[in-house]
């Protein structure tokens, strides 16, 4: 992921100035990386090393989303709607 794209995502999903660690920002960054890796794996079907990394990222994202769901359901709903997750 390019630095400019990462900074754009952080600005877009930050809850306050200088926020880089909130669940919203972390989930947005993970989603971007997951989408990029999905495109890579469509071309390179036998890249099992990257596939494992993808599964690890999906698991981490799921954990962050579960945390957010338990602690603040409104922020959770807003985030999944903005990211287009959970159709």
UniProtKB/Swiss-Prot annotation:
Residues 1-19 have a biased composition (Basic and acidic residues). InterPro entries: Ribosomal_uS15, Ribosomal_uS15_bac-type, uS15_NS1_RNA-bd_sf. Pfam families: Ribosomal_S15. The keyword RNA-binding applies. Residues 1-22 are annotated as: Disordered. Keywords: Ribonucleoprotein, Ribosomal protein, RNA-binding, rRNA-binding. PROSITE patterns: RIBOSOMAL_S15 (PS00362). GO terms for biological process: translation. GO terms for molecular function: rRNA binding; structural constituent of ribosome. One of its GO terms (cellular component) is cytosolic small ribosomal subunit. One of the primary rRNA binding proteins, it binds directly to 16S rRNA where it helps nucleate assembly of the platform of the 30S subunit by binding and bridging several RNA helices of the 16S rRNA. Forms an intersubunit bridge (bridge B4) with the 23S rRNA of the 50S subunit in the ribosome. NCBIfam families: S15_bact. Belongs to the universal ribosomal protein uS15 family. Part of the 30S ribosomal subunit. Forms a bridge to the 50S subunit in the 70S ribosome, contacting the 23S rRNA. This is Small ribosomal subunit protein uS15. It comes from Clostridium novyi (strain NT).
